């Protein structure tokens, strides 16, 4: 039989041991004795607690659980030799008894025998006959003890995990706990191969896969994002987050058709519970891609869908408005959409530029200048497009000198505008 510890304290966990699941159903007397034992423990009446357990040991001599609990009660009350004898008695009968192995580790730790403590933990954690659940419980206990100790030496915990990982592991719980521990210590790079082992063992583990995605996003490694997400959407086809990251990564890799297909696949898995903002984002990405492919009707249809699901989708509002203004069509609709973005993010140079440009296309030059100046104040001078727009707007407000200054600056920044050189030569605005 295998018993599984519920470890949550740094002392030899008598209460924990008491809550081990028995291998068989308890009789009424046993249930009563165990309940009394727990109550006596809570009341700190160790003498009566002793008596209850001793009576259970006598009544059920073949049930090793009670022998271990008796040892734990001895240890908690400073009767170290009696505790040792109780554990050894159990291990003589059941050498792989996880309760007794763990209690022996506690015994060695309490008696200051650090090397034996480590050896005992290895005996338990590297034992193929001990269940993964038990090992997980023990490692959680080890982590708690390590965090509570004055030394707080995470290298010991990591070394223990590493020894476990060298075995043939077929349960993803162990590498998952290890990766969570590494992440808690800000060791993200070290956690990556461990998380990869988790998803190899359990491709449906979405949490581990998203941690891998997060690590790749921080490194801006779109190839790694693709590598992690492609099998992810096969294993967990309902995980819309994976489609989203995959779409962004394909976009960076300039795989435009792949972006469209992954967004379409994501939309097939939308349910009544899916957040409307998420659906909107997929349509918005599709709008951006259709625009790069010069499929403007499809782009506008996608943006319309995005705004049906989330009328406040700022990215969709801005891009939709800007592309309309470039085509010089539906300018009132474009202005309305763009104004929402400026209201939502008044210091965003991209949104300020879009709004200024729409006002420019509508002939509202004085107002356009106010917004383009704001865009320039908010990092807009780093964009050759915004700088050129600034020159265009300045020209239309009668400031030819200012216009030339910004047009020349845009040219120096490497602008690919078709009319920019002509504007500088002729000293006047020329529409593209």
Annotate each language-model stretch with its function:
Residues 401:
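Residues that scaffold, gate, or flank divalent-cation-dependent active/transport sites
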